[in-house]
Design a protein with these regions (language model features):
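Cytoplasmic/organellar membrane-interface segments at the starts of transmembrane helices
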Residues: 150-152, 205-296
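Hydrophobic transmembrane alpha-helices and their helix-loop junctions in integral membrane proteins
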Residues: 1-211
Length: 296
C-alpha cells in the first residue's frame, strides 16, 4: 500500500518526485509504483483471498478517497513535478479501486491502466524535465507562452497530457473505461466517485498546459527556450506512437490478458465468494467475446 501509494500512505511520493532527477522520476512513475499494485495482484490477494474479501470494501473506500484527494491536491500545486506526482496518487487510486472490485473487467482494466499510467506519467515527467533543463525552474508561475518557441514540444506535450486525462483514441481511455465498468458492477457509489478522476485530470492538466505553454511569452528575449533536438525526439516519439497505438488497438493487448485474468479470479474469488457474496468467478479460459453471452 505504501509502494502504490494508497491513501493515506502516499505522503512520501510528492517529495520523492520533487527531489529526484528526471530519470529517477520517470523510473519511479513508470515502474516502481507498479510494484505495489503487482504485489497485491501477484501475492496479496491470491495468497490471502479471504482476507482480501474482508478488507476489500475498506480498501476500496481508501482508493476512492485517494482518487479525489490526489486530483484536488494536483489542482493547487505550484510545482510541475508536484502536480504530476499528485496525479499519480489519483490515477493509482483508480487502479487499486479496480483491483479491489474483484471482477473481470475491473481487473483487466487495472492491469492495462498500469501500463498506460507508466507510459503517460513517465512521458509527463520527461516533458517537465525538458522544460526544467532549459529554464532551470519547475514553478508554474515562472513559465508562459513556451509554445511560441517550442511548437513541436507543445504538440507532444498536448498528446501526452490528453492521454493522461483519458481522451478517447489514446491509451488512457481504454484502461479507464474498463475500470469504470468493473467498479460499477461491484459498487455503484464508488463508481460515481471514480469518474471524478476524468474531470479532475482534465482540470489540472489543461490548467497546467495553459499556464506553461499558452499565452504571451514570459520572457521574449530568453534564448534558452529552444524546440526539441534529435535526442529528445528519439525518446519521445516512440512513446507517442505507443500511446496512440494502445488507444486505437487495445484489443491487441487485452486479448493477451483474458486467460490469465480468468485464472487469477478463479484463485481469488472461489474462496472469497462465500465471504463477500460475490458471483462465481469466470470459467477458466473464458474470453471477452463469450463473457457477455455467458452472463446473459
Amino acid at each position: 500500500a505504501i509502494k502504490v501509494p494508497l491513501f493515506p500512505l502516499h505522503t512520501w511520493l510528492p517529495d520523492a518526485h520533487v527531489e529526484a532527477p528526471t530519470a529517477a522520476s520517470v523510473l519511479l512513475a513508470a515502474v516502481l509504483l507498479k510494484m505495489g499494485a503487482y504485489g497485491f495482484l501477484r501475492l496479496g490477494l491470491p495468497l490471502f483471498p479471504l482476507a482480501a474479501a474482508s478488507f476489500a470494501p475498506a480498501l476500496s473506500v481508501l482508493a476512492a478517497v485517494g482518487i479525489v484527494y490526489g486530483g484536488l491536491m494536483a489542482l493547487i500545486q505550484k510545482d510541475m513535478k508536484s502536480l504530476v506526482a499528485y496525479s499519480s496518487v489519483s490515477h493509482m487510486g483508480l487502479v487499486m479501486l479496480a483491483v479491489f472490485s474483484l471482477n473481470f473487467e475491473a481487473t483487466e482494466g487495472a492491469i492495462y491502466q498500469m501500463l498506460n499510467h507508466g507510459l503517460s506519467t513517465g512521458a509527463l515527467f520527461l516533458c517537465v524535465g525538458i522544460l526544467y533543463e532549459r529554464t532551470h525552474t519547475r514553478k508554474i508561475a515562472d513559465h508562459g507562452g513556451a509554445a511560441a518557441r517550442m511548437p513541436v514540444f507543445a504538440g507532444i506535450f498536448l498528446v501526452v497530457m490528453l492521454s493522461s486525462a483519458g481522451l478517447p483514441g489514446l491509451n488512457g481511455f481504454a484502461g479507464e473505461i474498463l475500470c469504470f465498468f468493473g467498479v460499477f458492477a461491484a459498487n455503484k457509489a464508488l463508481a460515481a466517485v471514480s469518474v471524478t478522476t476524468v474531470i479532475l485530470s482534465a482540470a489540472y492538466l489543461l490548467w497546467l498546459y495553459r499556464r506553461v505553454l499558452l499565452g504571451p511569452l514570459k520572457d521574449p528575449g530568453d534564448p534558452r527556450l529552444r524546440d526539441l533536438d534529435k535526442r529528445e525526439l528519439a525518446y519521445l516519439v516512440p512513446i507517442i506512437v505507443l500511446i496512440v497505438f494502445m488507444g486505437l488497438f487495445p484489443g491487441v493487448f487485452l486479448r493477451k490478458l483474458d486467460a490469465s485474468v480468468s485464472r487469477y479470479l478463479d484463485a481469488v474469488k472461489t474462496p472469497a465468494a462465500a465471504t463477500l457474496g460475490l458471483a462465481p468467478a469466470p470459467e477458466r479460459g473464458q474470453t471477452a467475446e463469450n463473457r457477455a453471452e455467458l452472463e446473459r
